[in-house]
């Protein structure tokens, strides 16, 4: 009887852990990086989270010389995303699997609309203003 109670207790703990653990940040992505709407590391480093087939935030303003890092915060097993400027040649990340990152430093001011190549038709678009 005592052994049965120990087994049931262990199973209950495992179920509770599985149900209440935080799985939202994807493998390798830190919880701080995946905060929505944006994480500002310091005045020159910004994080944009890719989650639920959207950029968070979908519009961001940064100073000239700032670095923006896009982090795929989807759960493991969800499709990969890109961050690609609407103007060819400015930037085009590879496919970012959950937990992956892509960074770019912006040395020229301007307005830069961008999108996710596989999910543009689903409305996965963003805008970066460098001022």
Range-by-range predicted roles:
Residues 1-18:
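Sec-dependent bacterial lipoprotein signal peptides
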Residues 19-131:
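Extracytoplasmic copper-binding redox domains, predominantly the cupredoxin/blue-copper superfamily
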